[in-house]
Amino acid sequence: MSSSSSTTTNTTTESDSSSLPTHIGRSNSDGIIDTTPFLPPTVTRTISVDEESNPIHRSARRQGLREAARFLRHAGSRRMMREPSMLVRETAAEQLEERQSDWAYSKPVVFLDILWNLAFVAIGVAVLILSRDEKPNMPLRVWVVGYGIQCWLHMACVCVEYRRRRRRRHPEDGGGSGLTNSSSQQYVSLAQLEDRGETSNPAKHLESANTMFSFIWWIIGFYWVSAGGQTLSSDSPQLYWLCIIFLGFDVFFVVFCVALACVIGLAVCCCLPCIIAILYAVADQEGASKNDIDQMPKFRFTKTGNVEKLSGKARGIMTECGTDSPIERSLSPEDAECCICLCEYEDGVELRELPCNHHFHCTCIDKWLHINSRCPLCKFNILKNANNEV
């Protein structure tokens, strides 16, 4: 009796498992791009040829923002952000990282950096001359000289890196017609070029060594100042306060950078539309043009009045605008949400569908495509698709 009941339960479980819907086959014919904006837990992402040739060049620099976004969403939200929304924020973090890297070596920032370090060197030399009669019980003069050498090395590395980036950037910008090929890839290409040259660039190695040495040198200076105590402040006040100021500035910059990284992480995680709007306002048009964006189909979302009548319990229907034979698609509750702003589609809102079949709010995706022509979810390049159609 027990054996027959067990066989019955086995057959029922097998039939139930066979009747379960499978969630495979959600990609197009070439198996690269997902056709729905919300993906299963095992997500297949589009990997470019450049990324495959250098598989670790992005992971180290981007890991901090990605892990911060995941942690903040776990800790501060009522519900965990779904995987597609996290992918969008990881893409936005990469975009910010690439633009920050390019901005850090722009002409005004490089000029201010060199001017700032020259001021430190000049102040150090002046205090060393004025305090020639002071006799500290700790080798503070050695520490000040070492600090000045670090400033000189930093300025040299910045100048070399700035000139290297300019040499790499001018061939990209000077092509004229090359912008029509893929103008949105300017920042991506620059980031990939600099990452590829990192292993063979002496300036990068020297800058990394200088950074590590400056950290160790700061600890040594802090120890000497602390060990000297009140004797230093009375016997060598100029050298003492110079070291205190240099140490304090270093701490200030570290705290400032950490706080800025936290603010950026919070903004990317919680206020991504604001970040996109700021980049849209201040950045040059490096992505798709308005004409390229307007060529993509626009849809209007309509909420369903009676959900029970629809198989699959769809949340609403998106209907193509501006055509005599509009295409209609029903959206499930999981799909009826914008991955950028994390807001559910309201009745009558306009949606934009990309060639990869991912859809977003028009106001959200249009600004993103103005900055970067790649889909924020699967990184499909809409300009490449437009050129192939031509």
UniProtKB/Swiss-Prot annotation:
Its main location: membrane. One of its GO terms (cellular component) is membrane. A zinc finger (RING-type) spans 338-379. Keywords: Membrane, Metal-binding, Transferase, Transmembrane, Transmembrane helix, Ubl conjugation pathway, Zinc, Zinc-finger. Signal peptide: none annotated. It is found in: Membrane. It is an enzyme of class 2 (transferase). SUPFAM superfamilies: RING/U-box (SSF57850). It is a multi-pass membrane protein. Pathway: Protein modification; protein ubiquitination. One of its GO terms (molecular function) is zinc ion binding. The chain crosses the membrane at residues 109-129, 142-162, 212-232, 244-264, 265-285. It catalyses: S-ubiquitinyl-[E2 ubiquitin-conjugating enzyme]-L-cysteine + [acceptor protein]-L-lysine = [E2 ubiquitin-conjugating enzyme]-L-cysteine + N(6)-ubiquitinyl-[acceptor protein]-L-lysine. Residues 1-19 have a biased composition (Low complexity). The RING-type zinc finger domain mediates binding to an E2 ubiquitin-conjugating enzyme. PANTHER family: RING-TYPE DOMAIN-CONTAINING PROTEIN, TARGET OF ERK KINASE MPK-1. This is E3 ubiquitin-protein ligase At4g11680. It comes from Arabidopsis thaliana.
